[in-house]
Amino acid sequence: MKPIFRRVAVIGKYPGPGAVSASDSARQIIESIAQFVTQQDCELTLEAETAAHTGLTQYHTLDVEGIGRQCDLCLVVGGDGTMLGVGRRLAGYGTPLVGINQGRLGFITDIPLEGYQDALTPILHGDYEEDVRPLMQACVMRGGECVFEALALNDVVVNRGSTSGMVELRVEVDGVFVSNQRADGLIVASPTGSTAYALSAGGPMLHPSIPGWVLVPIAPHTLSNRPIVLSDATEVAIEVAGGRDISANFDMQSLASLQHGDRILVRRSAHRVCFLHPRGWSYFATLRKKLGWYEGGS
């Protein structure tokens, strides 16, 4: 049976310069996956940086945007951080993503590297679970102009520097004042991000099907400042009212330094990310496994 995905791209995590043994390992992993994909009668494309850093230059290559324009499916080899970066860049193209976990936790890169062939074969032939996740669009407003803009799949975080004191943040939802918060920072998390930094800060987990966000203070000065669940149809505005050495992070991968009076506006993006999982995948099974929940029995 012919695969339904004809043009398949592979984007891999690769080590920095000087890590020879890690580089050799990355090359072996990517080459194994590339060979497997071609054996499935698919046209293989390697992301250009992946090919250059692993020395696998014998394959057809494209940059990430080219993959979005020309490929039917993208395999992301790495951890959740790798997937977050790729997801944001491909969101505007609608390219479905499959995660092969080479990292630690792997909430969204859920296929283990060992035995990936058994999980990947049915997906390539159309047997999979589809999992669509929303994105957040954020911009930093300064003097009435947007000076920095980014997408986020997990979260938007406004926080203090490592050597500074608490920050004071004025929070509005749809133009309505909520509170001034004195804390180490504030997290606006999507359902995807609710199991990341927001969870460690005491926030709730949101099921991916919930069209909502969670607003989570980081170490608030007032203990009554608790997490709030919001509709993702709202616009959240966070204004820097006090503190120093303050920054805004988007999925902890892009950063903007902030000044007093800056406003960070967060709204739902028009783009979404589509993950494909093996048949039988379950969000709750993922939570049980990754968070070590008790399953009962003797």
Curated annotation (Swiss-Prot):
Obligatory cofactor(s): a divalent metal cation
Entries under NCBIfam families matching the protein: PRK02155.1 (NF002561)
Any one Gene Ontology cellular component term annotated for this protein: cytoplasm
Positions annotated to bind NAD(+): D80, G81, N154, D155, R182, D184, T195, A196, Y197, A198, L199, S200, A219, Q253
GO biological process, one term: NAD metabolic process
Disulfide cross-links: none
Catalytic residues identified in the record: D80
Class of this enzyme: transferase
Keywords for the protein's UniProt record, in alphabetical order: ATP-binding, Cytoplasm, Kinase, NAD, NADP, Nucleotide-binding, Transferase
Cell compartments where the protein resides: Cytoplasm
Record field: catalytic activity: NAD(+) + ATP = ADP + NADP(+) + H(+)
Full protein name: NAD kinase
Organism: Acidovorax ebreus (strain TPSY)
Main location per the UniProt record: cytoplasm
Annotated family: Belongs to the NAD kinase family.
EC number: 2.7.1.23
GO MF annotation list: ATP binding; metal ion binding; NAD binding; NAD+ kinase activity
